[in-house]
Amino acid sequence: PLMASVKSFVWYSPGAFADKGYEVPETWDDLMTLTKKIADDTKDESGTKPWCAGIESGGATGWPATDWVEDLVLRSAGADAYDKWVTHEIPFNDPEIVKATDLVGNILLDDDYVNGGIGDSRSIATTSFNDGGLPILEGSCYMYRMASFYEAQWPEGTDVSPDGDVFAFYLPGMTADEKPLLTAGEFVGAFSDRPEVQAVQQYMSSGLWANTRVEIGGVTSANKAVDASKASSDVLRLAIELLQDPDATARFDGSDLMPSEVGAGSFWTGMTQWINGEKDTETVLTDIENSWPTS
């Protein structure tokens, strides 16, 4: 891809964590233990929850919830099952996918855990993903799962750094040794084979261009020649380091690889219905399975 983003990020307030003695989790179980701990610690604080979330995005409402599911399929079922799921070698309602979705539901459908500073779990469906993480700045939410590009959504003047107002940590795998990584990106397409077009395309795939663009700011790149130290921010530097980590098991955003009827259709709407409590996990996943094109 020309540019890339890391989706396996959890945004948080380093200061709030330090004040409460919370540590960045290293495993999924650690994350769930931390979630329960925060819920217990804040039960007397009206409106404060461990997590905040938002999946509203106009005609694309639901896509942030699909990212959650993809991250958990990659973690709980593994890369091989993830690949088979994306290519429909296993059905959308396979038991492994049901399990992964229910793991997401352990957070997003639990009113004790969401939606900090906003409402209950169903408010997630009407909260813009752009606004979903902002309660962290108000102290009414402690964590928000969203990609590296969310850095641009924080209000002007927000200190985004390891010791600042907000930062991000890697969404942990099931064990500390595993490093599944959900990614996304944009691609360059050539519509002519003229020499000058090929020359531009070759240049845009070079380490020189990637390093120059990363240094300008606001983006990351999966180009292996990129020097992470050239990144314009600490978050983007962390994203590049994760993309280049030889121990990471990286996979591209699954919904982007699925047929559009599913990846940009029934998967989005199905997850929105699920968040709204209209359908349970198996019903939603079966509906999505039945929407998969036969040819």
Model-derived features with residue positions:
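Conserved C-terminal helix/tail region of periplasmic/extracytoplasmic solute-binding proteins
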Residues: 18, 40, 241-295
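Short, solvent-exposed loop/beta-turn-alpha elements that line the ligand-binding surface or hinge
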Residues: 55-59, 75-99, 156-161, 173-181, ...
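Periplasmic solute-binding protein
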Residues: 1-29, 54-85, 182-189, 262-272
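Short helices/loops that flank or line small-molecule/ion binding pockets
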Residues: 16-19, 33-42, 126-144, 269, ...
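Bilobed periplasmic-binding protein-like "clamshell/Venus-flytrap" ligand-binding domains
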Residues: 40-60, 115, 210-217, 294-295
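Non-transmembrane alpha-helical segments in soluble domains
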Residues: 9, 14, 32-39, 70, ...
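Extracytoplasmic/periplasmic substrate-recognition and gating elements
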Residues: 20, 143-149, 155-220
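Extracytoplasmic ligand-binding clamshell segments of periplasmic binding protein
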Residues: 57, 78-157
